[in-house]
Design a protein with these regions (language model features):
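Polybasic, lysine-rich low-complexity intrinsically disordered segments
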Residues: 3-7, 24, 28
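Aromatic (phenylalanine/tyrosine) cluster motif
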Residues: 8-12, 21
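Serine residues within intrinsically disordered or low-complexity segments
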Residues: 16-17
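Conserved alpha/beta enzyme-core scaffold
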Residues: 30-178
Length: 178
């Protein structure tokens, strides 16, 4: 039986990182990890509409600004971004929000970008928020090939209403996967 593969590609650009992820379609997967140093203009060529893109940093600090800006100048759309936040209006990932490049954002703190909030309430952007520790563990688990995990943090709140829930040791837990 041939295994599907998921490829984790880390680009290190001036101390910042961008990881491209393909969506996991089956659990029986071969994991390939590739690390390269590339120019931002070369990294941009690898991103296609519909991709899942993971960006480091928080609050417009520590993220690959040049890469974000170069992608903002393309016609790429329907991206899912995994990032702590969505920048501020028209700054950092806020450019992607303003350009309507995103279909979904997964992270911890989106309320700083009022344009993202407006698109969310208008039903034009899917935002999936979670506590910071759950976000970090989701990334770690995904990088290790773990399909998901149960956590009690946030269980029973509006943030986890869409998640599978179980009671474990008399505590409500919800299933988390990126």
């Amino acid at each position: 039986m041939q295994k599907n593969q998921i490829i984790f590609v880390g680009f290190y650009i001036l101390g910042s990182s961008l990881a491209l992820y393909t969506e996991i379609k089956e659990l029986n997967m071969e994991v390939i990890i590739i690390a390269k140093i590339v120019e931002a203009v070369e990294a941009v060529k690898l991103v296609r509409s519909g991709d899942v893109v993971m960006i480091g940093g928080f609050g417009n600090v520590g993220n690959p600004k040049r890469l974000i800006d170069l992608l903002a100048d393309t016609d790429i759309h329907d991206l899912t971004v995994i990032a702590n936040d969505l920048g501020t209006p028209n700054v950092g990932l806020g450019r992607w929000v303003r350009n309507r490049m995103l279909k979904k954002a997964i992270g911890t703190y989106f309320t700083y970008n009022t344009e993202a909030a407006e698109l969310y309430f208008d039903g034009k952007l899917n935002l999936e928020m979670m506590p910071q520790g759950t976000f970090a563990e989701s990334i770690r688990a995904g990088g290790c090939g773990i399909g998901g995990f149960y956590t009690k943090v946030g269980a029973g709140t509006e943030l986890t209403a869409h998640c599978e829930t179980k009671v474990i040791d008399a505590k409500p837990m919800f299933w988390r996967i990126l």
